[in-house]
């Protein structure tokens, strides 16, 4: 049954609690662990760790807010079909999708469906865990608590650009998803 467009809104998922101290990434997530579907994946990623490998160290943050974009949502870049710009949205789940908005910000997403179906989860906020000095580099005016709050700041903190588009979060590389302690509290869900 088709959902009327007027009722479709991106789903925002947030973690209500801070990460336990001393958390470490145990291992890279495997594609088989990622649920199929944007809403399920958005919820699953809360509490996981986003890792950016750099020549001089590692930046790491606990995912605390995500936003699901469904194929039938007019706000989803896949809504009007595949183009060269949004091709990564249509790859198997777990692929990086990066786009540039307002002439100023990169947005970091992960593809969320089976190959050929365009859907994504936008990373909206991270709790910095490691590499805070590297996150601040060139952004000294940003308070530590705000370094990765908001999707534009998150991408800037991780130094993500369009060149990451299409990479695999589940394969060895400069950007990957790791396992972490799941939040003990309730995970909130709302429409935007």
Regions found by a protein language model. Give the residues of each.
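Conserved, well-structured core segments that form or line functional sites
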Residues: 2-192
């Amino acid at each position: 049954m088709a959902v009327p467009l007027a009722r479709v809104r991106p789903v925002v998922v947030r973690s209500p609690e801070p990460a336990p101290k001393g958390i470490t990434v145990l291992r890279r997530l495997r594609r088989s662990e990622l649920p199929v579907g944007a809403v399920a994946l958005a919820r699953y990623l809360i509490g996981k760790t986003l890792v950016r490998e750099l020549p001089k160290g590692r930046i790491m943050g606990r995912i605390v807010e995500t936003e699901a974009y469904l194929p039938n949502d007019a706000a989803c870049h896949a809504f009007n079909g595949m183009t060269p710009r949004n091709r990564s949205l249509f790859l198997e789940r777990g692929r990086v999708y990066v786009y540039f908005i307002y002439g100023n910000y990169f947005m970091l997403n992960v593809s969320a469906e089976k190959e050929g179906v365009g859907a994504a989860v936008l990373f909206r906020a991270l709790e910095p865990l490691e590499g805070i000095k590297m996150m601040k580099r060139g952004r000294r005016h940003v308070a530590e608590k705000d370094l990765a709050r908001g999707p534009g700041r998150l991408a800037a903190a991780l130094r993500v650009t369009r060149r990451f588009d299409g990479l695999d979060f589940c394969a060895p590389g400069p950007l990957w998803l790791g396992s972490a302690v799941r939040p003990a509290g309730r995970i909130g869900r709302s429409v935007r």
